[in-house]
């Protein structure tokens, strides 16, 4: 057997092995030092792939070198030997036919198996019979097959049971990593999630309907990754409290009654209908055409889960109402004097209907001056103001219909009589203050005048001449002579107001006023 060239002559190994080997040799760069080393590529190989043990910086002057399986140079473990002197390659006892030796000392092993995992030793001898022994190693791993998830409970009951899920990889479990996911999200240990050592088994405690899945188990080793098919749990639960739809509870005669009942349950619940507590139908839907007021009553949806043995009910009250009739509006007087009162009466045959008052096509805002009576049918406005003038209507409604009355226009006549209530409060206050000031001024002037009058009286009393000393005749040398002079004496008795008898009486003041009358 001749030594294979490092250039990999065609025909010595299969073409795919040549390509792989060439790529491996090209991808490996020798160590930066001149030290002889052995490296395996790849270090972790998938079963069936090729592995090459590359020798860097081969010794110069090598006379022979050989590869051995294991950490030994025993001839019993020899794979292949090359002797430079004879340029021959000699197969050893453990040669499998898959090994190829290259002139640079590298060893190619094709289609590796799990048994090929381990250490390989190269022994080199130079011309001076000096030996150099080096080792290299690699690991062979099985390509992972698709794993499968199994469960210890195929039909767990919500809130009662726990479930264990196991990931079966069908390959050697050594060097396998297990990862779990649910609905695409990774799972880790928590309050209700427990993982076994190595994560091969996932346990769910007290399962709920949200634990249904799907679950996926992912397996990994150094050479491959694989995923299981999605696995979902069939969790038994329910029924929940049923829901009856639609939400309408009022209908008018002649319409169709169509009810649907739904309750979350696994397996699906059984449905039963009762009308006024009497069994009617065993279906999820209830349909009654052309209903009348006789169809008013209680409608019950009864649901049952045969596996859990649980039952739930929901009751819905349905009322069939006749449409309301159009009301009529009356008023005591359509023309009202301002500040008077007015009463509007809504006449309706529908006593259980809702009353709504309309003012100028908008909702009437009920104020303090407005009162309603007889379930809102009578509206009284007292007192009425000019802003209350306008169009009034009443509206009658029930859950299935609405009617509006005729319109009445109310006129409010303005009262020409001054209404103090219409005067702004600021004006009233200003007038009151001005009046107080005016009265105070008048009182002050009266007091001042009275004081001056008393002073004048005192002056007259002190300076009046006596009757015996007064010259009654004019002076002869007076520039203006008068023919006759007449004098009169007026006595003024100052009258004091009546006082209580208990008060001491004061003397009356007597004053004499002289008046001169001249004749020309």
Swiss-Prot record:
Residue stretches of biased makeup (Polar residues): 466-480, 490-513
Residue ranges constituting the Ig-like C2-type domain according to the UniProt record: 145-234, 239-319, 327-411
Glycosylation sites per record: 87, 104, 148, 152, 175, 199, 206, 210, 226, 258, 290, 294, 304, 317, 333, 361
GO terms for cellular component: cell surface; external side of plasma membrane; plasma membrane
Residues annotated as domain Ig-like V-type: 35-141
BP GO annotations: energy homeostasis; negative regulation of brown fat cell proliferation; negative regulation of feeding behavior
Region described as Disordered: 457-520
Tissues expressed in: Isoform 2 is detected in elongating spermatids within the seminiferous epithelium (at protein level). Expressed in kidney, colon, uterus, gut mononuclear cells, crypt epithelia of intestinal tissues, and to a lesser extent, in spleen. Expressed in brain including VMH, globus pallidus, ventral pallidum, striatum, olfactory bulb and hippocampus. Also detected in rectal carcinoma cell line CMT93. Isoform 2 and isoform 3 are expressed in testis. Isoform 2 is detected in seminiferous tubule, not detected in epididymal spermatozoa.
Secretion signal, residue range per the UniProt entry: 1-34
PANTHER family given in the database record: CARCINOEMBRYONIC ANTIGEN-RELATED CELL ADHESION MOLECULE 1, CARCINOEMBRYONIC ANTIGEN-RELATED CELL ADHESION MOLECULE 19
Protein name: Cell adhesion molecule CEACAM2
Organism placement in taxonomy: Eukaryota, Metazoa, Chordata, Craniata, Vertebrata
């Amino acid at each position: 057997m001749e030594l294979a060239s490092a250039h990999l002559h065609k025909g010595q190994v299969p073409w795919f092995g040549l390509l792989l080997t060439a790529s491996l040799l090209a991808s490996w760069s020798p160590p930066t030092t001149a030290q002889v080393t052995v490296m395996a590529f790849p270090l972790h190989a998938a079963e069936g792939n090729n592995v090459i043990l590359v020798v860097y910086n081969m010794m110069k002057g090598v006379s022979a070198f050989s590869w051995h399986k294991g950490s030994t140079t025993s001839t019993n473990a020899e794979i292949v030997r090359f002797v430079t002197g004879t340029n021959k390659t000699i197969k050893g006892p453990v040669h499998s036919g898959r090994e190829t030796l290259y002139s640079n000392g590298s060893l190619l092993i094709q289609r590796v198996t799990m048994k090929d995992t381990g250490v390989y030793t190269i022994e080199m001898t130079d011309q001076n019979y000096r030996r150099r022994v080096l080792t290299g190693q690699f690991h062979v791993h099985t390509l992972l097959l698709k794993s499968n998830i199994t469960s210890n409970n195929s039909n767990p009951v919500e809130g009662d049971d726990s479930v264990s899920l196991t990931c079966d990889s069908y390959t050697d479990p050594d060097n396998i990593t297990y990862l779990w996911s649910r609905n695409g999200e990774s799972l880790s240990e928590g309050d209700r999630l427990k993982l076994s050592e190595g994560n091969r088994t996932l346990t769910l405690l007290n399962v709920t309907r949200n634990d249904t899945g799907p679950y996926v188990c992912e397996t990994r080793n150094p050479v491959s990754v694989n995923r299981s098919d999605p696995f979902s749990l069939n969790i038994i639960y329910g029924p929940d409290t049923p829901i009856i739809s639609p939400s309408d509870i009022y209908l008018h005669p002649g319409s169709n009654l169509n009810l649907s009942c739904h309750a979350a349950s696994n397996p699906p619940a059984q449905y039963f209908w009762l009308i006024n507590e009497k069994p009617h139908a065993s279906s999820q839907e209830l349909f009654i055409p052309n209903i009348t007021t006789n169809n008013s009553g209680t409608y019950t949806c009864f649901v049952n889960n045969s596996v859990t043995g649980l039952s739930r009910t929901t009751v819905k009250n349905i009322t069939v109402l006749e449409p309301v009739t159009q009301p009529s509006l009356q008023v005591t007087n359509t023309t009202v004097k301002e500040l008077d009162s007015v009463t509007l009466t809504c006449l309706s045959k529908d006593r259980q209907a809702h009353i709504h008052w309309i003012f100028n096509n908008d909702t009437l805002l009920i104020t303090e001056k407005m009162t309603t009576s007889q379930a809102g049918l009578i509206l009284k406005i007292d007192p009425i103001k000019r802003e209350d003038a306008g169009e009034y209507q009443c509206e009658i409604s029930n859950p299935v219909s609405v009617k509006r009355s005729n319109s009445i226009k109310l006129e409010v006549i303005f009262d020409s009589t001054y209404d103090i209530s219409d005067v702004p409060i600021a004006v009233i206050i200003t007038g009151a203050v001005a009046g107080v000031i005016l009265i105070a001024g008048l009182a002050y002037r009266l007091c001042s005048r009275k004081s001056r009058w008393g002073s004048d009286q005192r002056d007259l009393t002190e300076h009046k001449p006596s009757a015996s000393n007064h010259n009654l005749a004019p002076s002869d040398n007076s520039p203006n002579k008068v023919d006759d002079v007449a004098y009169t004496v007026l006595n003024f008795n100052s009258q004091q107001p009546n006082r209580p008898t208990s008060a001491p009486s004061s003397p009356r003041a007597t004053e004499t006023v002289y008046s001169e009358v001249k004749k020309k």
